């Protein structure tokens, strides 16, 4: 591999005798892995589990497979999986993933929350925020709001609000050189220092959003000390934080002069490059006096939703019902009014109000477990291939007309309308594949 000018010399100085093994590891193939989604009701048994992780496995799952389409698995390399594992929120917590796209860490945080509490997944890039929405919906997370904002604008709404903030910061990307060689095109000796300036700027806003006793998990996919240990030392000097120890598992090593932090090198850890630090906020931020979100449905809309829910659902969905145009969303409770922010997904998309009727969304059919739905229809592998390509499906027998959750391998793939023995196609056009 042809490294950028100055890279080899830098890491020979940092790593000493280990530099040779470190540099040789770039000639090896990048490590692929995925996580199994514990929010799904019909798990599949997978081999080659990643040691000391709850849901991780080495290997690849096709993006065109039923496992991927239903959100049962999420592809994410092993080092990246360690960040949310360090954060490990408890159900009921208020959590912010500040730089969330494409969604690996947010889906993992949502798995820990298990539908309780609030997860705000933020992405400043509009294009990447759309990908984030797709991945969160496929995962079936019900308590997630996706915002498309800068950290400073979020800070105006969420002062002192979050129990946990995860920042996988924009960085020089050295840890991705093996997986994405194009990342080397941007690298220069002074690039890490440029990135560090942006990281400090984002973190300054992040700190103001922490509740007293709240935790901050800071990570990068680079090895540059300027963006890692130097940033952590800056946080400890500028703000009232305690540095919490990160458990070094699976070949992680201590950070440079900061043994509580963790580094992942590809010659020691079976994965790509990552740094992670875990801090607890001891300072005080003004307690937020925010206006809570409220339902804005008309009586007719409430009646239409209740009619659908009574006929099709076995559970009551907790949260705040809000319409945006003719679209119905379920917002997490205790969420501030987000009217001043750019929103990419305002909670769980439940469906659409049409003339005197309500049509369920694809996202709702992904989020609900089969045990929570009164009517479902299972399709086999052959029918799945046709369905995701946009075709209608001929069922083996006629069913009563109406809406059914489509199941593949026991997991939801949206809702669809059945007429007799015909399953109409409601798989979103933008997601279809052959």
Describe the function of each predicted region:
Residues 127, 163-202, 221-228:
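Mobile active-site "lid"/loop adjacent to the S-adenosyl-L-methionine
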Residues 124-159:
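S-adenosyl-L-methionine
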Residues 162, 215-218, 222-329:
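Class I S-adenosyl-L-methionine
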Residues 114, 210-212:
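Helix-to-beta-strand junctions that scaffold the AdoMet/dcAdoMet cofactor pocket
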Residues 1-40, 272-275, 282-434:
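Polybasic, low-complexity RNA-engagement segments
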Residues 92-101:
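Conserved class I S-adenosyl-L-methionine
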Residues 102-115:
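Conserved SAM-binding loop of SAM-dependent methyltransferases across substrates and taxa
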Residues 90-91, 155-166:
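A short acidic, Gly/Pro-enriched loop at the edge of an enzyme's catalytic core
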């Amino acid at each position: 591999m042809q490294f950028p000018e100055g890279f080899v010399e830098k890491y020979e100085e940092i790593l000493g005798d280990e530099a040779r093994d470190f540099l040789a590891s770039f000639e090896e193939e990048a490590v692929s892995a995925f996580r199994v989604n514990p929010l799904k009701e019909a798990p599949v048994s997978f081999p080659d589990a990643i040691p000391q992780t709850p849901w991780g496995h080495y290997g690849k799952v096709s993006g065109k497979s039923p496992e991927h389409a239903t959100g049962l698995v999420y592809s994410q390399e092993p080092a990246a999986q360690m960040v949310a594992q360090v954060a490990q929120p408890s159900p009921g917590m208020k959590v912010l993933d500040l730089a969330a796209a494409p969604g690996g860490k947010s889906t993992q945080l949502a798995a820990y929350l298990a539908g309780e509490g609030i997860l705000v997944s933020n992405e400043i890039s509009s294009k990447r925020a759309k990908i984030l929405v797709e991945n969160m919906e496929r995962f079936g997370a019900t308590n997630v709001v996706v915002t498309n904002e800068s950290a400073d604008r979020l800070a105006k709404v969420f002062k002192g609000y979050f129990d946990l903030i995860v920042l996988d910061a924009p960085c020089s990307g050295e840890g991705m050189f093996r997986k994405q060689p194009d990342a080397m095109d941007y690298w220069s000796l002074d690039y890490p220092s440029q990135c560090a300036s942006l990281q400090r700027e984002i973190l300054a806003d992040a700190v103001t959003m922490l509740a007293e006793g709240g935790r901050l998990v800071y990570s990068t996919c680079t090895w540059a000390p300027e963006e890692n240990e130097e940033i952590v030392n800056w946080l400890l000097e500028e703000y009232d934080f305690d540095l919490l120890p990160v458990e070094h598992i699976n070949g992680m090593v201590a950070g440079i002069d900061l043994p509580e932090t963790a580094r992942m090198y590809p010659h020691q850890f079976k994965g790509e490059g990552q740094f992670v630090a875990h801090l607890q906020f001891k300072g005080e931020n003004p307690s937020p006096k925010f206006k809570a979100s409220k339902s804005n449905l008309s009586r007719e809309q409430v009646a239409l939703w209740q009619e659908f829910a009574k006929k099709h659902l076995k559970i009551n969905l907790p949260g705040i019902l809000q319409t945006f145009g003719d679209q119905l969303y379920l917002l997490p409770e205790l969420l501030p009014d987000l009217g001043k922010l750019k929103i990419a997904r305002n909670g769980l998309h439940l469906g659409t109000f049409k003339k005197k009727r309500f049509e369920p969304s694809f996202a709702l059919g992904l989020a609900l477990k089969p045990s929570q739905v009164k009517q479902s229809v299972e399709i086999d592998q052959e029918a799945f291939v046709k369905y995701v390509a946009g075709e209608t499906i001929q069922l083996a027998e006629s069913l009563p007309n109406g809406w059914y959750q489509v199941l593949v391998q026991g997991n939801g793939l949206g809702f669809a309308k059945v007429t007799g023995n015909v399953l109409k196609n409601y798989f979103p056009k933008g997601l279809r594949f052959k």
